[in-house]
């Protein structure tokens, strides 16, 4: 006869336990991995711009001077870290897959950052739900698959990972946390300067408030003065590190502050006056998270511990609404006309996730699997709709081949002259720039341009001239008038709207490509291109090129080394009461 056994009592429901971070990263792989392998981000708005920058680093790592756009410009006008990683990986897997890999790393970093950031305010279970939500955010899918804002999706997670190290340093005076936090801040700044400026307030100030509030919590025993002093030390070291790592960027910015006429952008409009803007900048990136706004406001204002987080969310939300409210313009002044505001949706969503993690925990405690299924379905639909949105709201014209254009420019010495494209859109224009050896008068990164024909009219790229109305066409006419000065001999046209202007200005059609989709217009008597005085004065020195090729990417490598060599202190385990049966265990024989 076998020995007696004890009947098993009820177990702690799995829904009441935190979800392991490894499972959340697996979810990110399952959701975004196939989409990235399909290379869906390739068609996003800014993807080719990042690949254009990366292709230059792949060939000229220590020389950030790029001749291919604006008759020559310095890539020190844009922080380079993620583009340098794309350049490195491109030698192994090609440019397109390298972009996908670097974007995937950013996607994996986001739930890690959200989990660490949320733990400052909520327990491990709610933080794990917040991390799950970050994988399925509509704003993340919008920035990855529609806007192509690789820099924002890289910088934001790095700040989220860095700030908990500041929190530990300020409360516990742990030097390893200070070191890792400062290096991560430098790495985040090397990914994006705009996120640096705004994350310093939106993400960081609530954490500073919590460091003061929690100065006696757990094992910490700090004073208000001590927290403030350590905050100033962290701030000073971070500022010094960012100043050194991005020195070439700051030098160019101070030597050439942005004074050009503002360029219109839809994100500065009032979203509530046009349904397409409301869909593109409000409904799609926010998705089902809009349904949680009442809970965020009530919970965030009710609980003192959540108020700093809520205030950060509220500020980010006001900026995410762009020109729908006057607040961003009041705060930023003229700088309002320089920024675009779709990126602030991600910042606002991230600030809301810890509170929504509490909501998810409450709902699952009440309704169990029904709540889990409903929340999961809403999050999945939000992500799916944002991924599919470019199919219904295209941000560039129908695809066409530019291979013959590139081949023409790269043969028979044609790259001695400059060219522009008309009707290509910035996406295709950047593709041409990436693979040709010729230089263009046009360019895509607006902050890098210095030519007066482009800075004085308040229009964007020449290839999109007609979409900027009178200002855009006047800018194009000014460039055509000075074709001799710039060595502008070739114009590739994908929109017949421009052909009467070209014919009137003395250009003639010479060749046809891609079964008539593209025509080549040339002008006789144009001398070969030569350097322009506007651009050569901004050329980086060799020392700046050396700094640019080592410090930004070096900060990210150093951060990885420090995190590996100085592992985080293990958090105290959260205890669960062992479930005890209400009656004596039943003894029975096992047969």
What would you call each of these model-derived segments?
Residues 18-23, 29-160, 164-165, 187-188, ...:
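Active-site lumenal/periplasmic loops and adjacent helix-entry segments of GT-C-fold
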Residues 30-39, 60, 129-145, 241-260, ...:
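Membrane-interface helix-loop junctions at the exits of transmembrane helices
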Residues 43-46, 188-297, 301-307, 322-328:
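Transmembrane catalytic cores of multi-pass membrane glycosyltransferases
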Residues 51, 55, 154-171, 183-184, ...:
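Specific aromatic-rich, kink-prone transmembrane helix
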Residues 284-314, 318, 362, 557-571:
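Hydrophobic, aromatic-rich transmembrane alpha-helices
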């Amino acid at each position: 006869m076998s020995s007696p056994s004890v009947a098993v009592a009820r177990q702690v429901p799995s829904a009441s336990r935190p979800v392991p971070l490894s499972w959340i990263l697996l979810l990110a792989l399952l959701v975004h991995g196939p989409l990235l392998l399909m290379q869906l981000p390739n068609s996003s708005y800014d993807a080719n711009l990042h690949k254009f920058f990366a292709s230059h680093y792949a060939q000229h790592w220590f020389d950030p001077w790029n001749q291919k756009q604006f008759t020559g410009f310095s890539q020190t006008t844009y922080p380079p870290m993620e583009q340098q990683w794309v350049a490195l990986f491109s030698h192994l897997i090609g440019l397109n897959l390298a972009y996908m890999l670097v974007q995937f790393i950013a996607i994996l970093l986001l739930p890690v950052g959200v989990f660490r950031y949320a733990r400052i305010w909520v327990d491990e279970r709610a933080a794990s739900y917040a991390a799950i939500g970050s994988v399925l955010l509509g704003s993340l899918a919008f920035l990855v698959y529609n806007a192509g804002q690789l820099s924002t999706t890289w910088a934001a997670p790095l700040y989220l990972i860095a700030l908990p190290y500041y929190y530990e340093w300020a409360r516990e005076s742990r030097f390893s946390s200070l070191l890792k936090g400062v290096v991560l801040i430098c790495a985040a700044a090397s990914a994006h300067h705009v996120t640096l400026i705004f994350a310093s307030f939106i993400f960081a100030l609530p954490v500073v408030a919590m460091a003061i509030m929690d100065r006696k919590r757990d094992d910490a025993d700090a004073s208000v003065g001590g927290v403030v002093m350590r905050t100033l030390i962290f701030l000073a070291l971070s500022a010094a590190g960012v100043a050194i790592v991005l020195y070439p960027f700051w030098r160019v910015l101070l030597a050439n502050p942005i004074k050009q006429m503002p360029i219109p952008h839809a994100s500065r409009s009032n979203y509530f006056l046009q349904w397409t803007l409301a869909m593109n900048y409000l409904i799609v990136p926010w998705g089902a998270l809009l349904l949680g706004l009442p809970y965020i406001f009530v919970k965030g204002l009710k609980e003192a511990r959540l108020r700093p987080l809520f205030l950060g969310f509220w500020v980010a939300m006001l900026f995410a609404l762009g020109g729908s409210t006057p607040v961003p313009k009041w705060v930023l002044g003229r700088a309002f006309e320089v920024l675009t505001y779709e990126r602030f949706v991600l910042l606002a969503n991230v600030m809301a996730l810890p509170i929504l993690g509490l909501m998810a925990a409450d709902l699952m405690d009440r309704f169990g699997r029904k709540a889990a299924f409903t929340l999961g379905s809403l999050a999945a639909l939000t992500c799916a709709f944002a991924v599919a949105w470019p199919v219904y709201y295209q941000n560039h014209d129908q695809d066409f081949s530019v291979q013959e254009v590139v081949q023409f420019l790269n043969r028979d010495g044609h790259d001695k002259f400059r060219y522009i494209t008309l009707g290509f859109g910035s996406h295709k224009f950047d593709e041409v720039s990436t693979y040709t050896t010729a230089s263009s008068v046009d360019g895509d990164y607006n902050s890098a341009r210095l030519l007066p024909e482009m800075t004085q009219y308040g229009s964007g790229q020449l290839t999109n001239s007609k979409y900027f109305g009178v200002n855009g066409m006047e800018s194009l006419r000014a460039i055509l008038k000075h074709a001799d000065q710039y060595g502008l001999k070739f114009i590739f046209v994908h929109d017949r709207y421009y052909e009467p202007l070209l014919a009137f200005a003395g250009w003639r059609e010479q060749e046809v490509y891609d079964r008539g989709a593209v025509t080549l217009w040339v002008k006789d008597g144009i001398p070969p291109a030569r350097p322009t005085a506007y651009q050569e004065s901004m050329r980086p020195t060799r020392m700046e090129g050396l700094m640019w090729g080592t410090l930004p990417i070096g900060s990210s490598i150093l951060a990885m080394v420090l995190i590996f060599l100085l592992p985080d202190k293990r958090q105290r385990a959260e205890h669960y009461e062992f479930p005890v049966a209400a009656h004596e265990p039943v003894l029975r024989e096992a047969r």
